[in-house]
Amino acid sequence: MKLSNCNTRTPRAARGFTLIELMVVISVVAILTTIAVSAYRTYVRRTTRTEARMALLAIQVAQEKFFLQNNQYAQSLATAIAAPPAGLGIQLTAGGQTLGGHYTVSFTAATANTYTVQAVAIGTQTADTAACRTFRIDDQGVRFPLDSSGCWR
């Protein structure tokens, strides 16, 4: 009669994963997720800059049209939001925010012959690069920040 050995061990490969192996895998996945989320947020902030650029460039074009019709530039945000011919017809909220809600647009140093309009980041967009939180453009087409910072691209 043959006795079976109850202490026979199963080969290691058939037993599954150890707790340490699972923890290493979870740690690696957590690190990769952190890197991916950070890169995604940076990408979203860079993409949202388009909102400010579009608003400022739309105001610039509308200002030139307004100047041709009225022989002066619009000097206030209320005029910018008002429908033509009395205003520029720019799509902003009553408080001067872009429709996406990431920038506040305002006129600075506006006269009948000159203007400077700026868009300042608000909310989550304030986490953007310091150089790209405020955009400005004037009646001469001068843009701030300078294009070397990459904000207008």
Regions found by a protein language model. Give the residues of each.
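N-terminal leader/signal peptides at the extreme start of proteins
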Residues: 1-17
